[in-house]
Design a protein with these regions (language model features):
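Basic, Lys/Arg- and aromatic-enriched nucleic-acid-binding interface segment
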Residues: 1-42, 46-47, 56, 66-70, ...
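Short, contiguous acidic/charged loop-to-helix segments that flank catalytic cores in large enzymes
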Residues: 5, 21-22, 63-70, 97-103, ...
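Catalytic-site neighborhood detector that most strongly recognizes the C-terminal catalytic loop/helix
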Residues: 7, 64-68, 78-80, 150-176
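Active-site/catalytic core of tyrosine-dependent DNA strand-transfer enzymes
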Residues: 7-14, 57, 74-122, 191
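C-terminal secondary-structure termini that scaffold catalytic or DNA-interacting sites
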Residues: 18, 57, 85, 92, ...
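C-terminal catalytic core of tyrosine-transesterase DNA break-rejoin enzymes
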Residues: 30-33, 37-44, 111-114, 130-153, ...
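A structural signal for short hydrophobic beta-strand segments in well-ordered beta-sheet cores
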Residues: 51-53
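Well-ordered beta-strand positions in beta-sheet-rich domains
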Residues: 59, 70-74, 159
Length: 191
């Protein structure tokens, strides 16, 4: 089957951000914001340790990544500011601690369902945040950079998922190009 292609529209993203402002669980709100901003997997966010976050160097080290080698997630100044604002707990290595602070929070499922309902996000699953961030990266910097940022093992994975999502962008560019050609053709034909 083709890969899931659901991404949040601009309007859905606005509704989600508004719902996040009212979210009572700070961990749910921060994890969702982090996933939407960086394209990280929710499990990566939940398992993040303070020792792996470099706020000055704007990077997040993933010590036991999916691909088997050390990987990094680039942080923007806005994401660093989000992380700086998180509470820290004595002797707790986790950004998002569980109730006893000995382990990280295991899930945000209930919180995500609450947020999706509040933002009226029909059919949206939490992994769609990663795809939404990925599409924004593709649009801003191309498939190659998005592939690296999302830490896909092969650029073909990125192309398979995001190329179909770019059809609207491609169509828009083709219409612009077509209009310029039509105008050029008309000028030549009118002479």
């Amino acid at each position: 089957p083709p890969p899931r292609s659901r991404v949040l529209s601009d309007d859905e993203q606005r509704r989600l951000l508004k719902a996040l402002d009212a979210e009572p669980d700070w961990i749910v709100a921060a994890v969702v914001r982090l996933a939407l901003a960086t394209g990280c997997r929710v499990g990566e966010a939940l398992g993040a340790r303070w020792a792996d976050i470099d706020l000055e160097g704007l990077s997040w080290r993933l010590p036991s990544p999916k691909a088997g080698n050390v990987q990094f997630i680039a942080l923007t100044p806005a994401v660093a500011k989000l992380l700086e604002g998180l509470p820290r707990f004595d002797d707790c290595p986790w950004l998002f601690p569980g109730p006893d602070q000995k382990k990280h929070r295991a899930s945000i499922r209930a919180g995500w369902e609450r947020l999706a309902d509040a933002a009226q996000l029909d059919g949206v699953i939490v992994h769609d945040l990663r795809r939404t961030a990925g599409l924004a990266l593709v649009r801003a910097a191309g498939l190659h950079v998005a592939s690296k940022a999302l830490r896909h093992s092969d650029a073909r994975v990125t192309a398979r998922v995001y190329a179909p999502l770019q059809l609207g962008d491609i169509r828009e560019a083709m219409v612009k190009a077509e209009k310029s050609r039509v105008l050029r053709f008309r000028k030549k034909g009118a002479a």
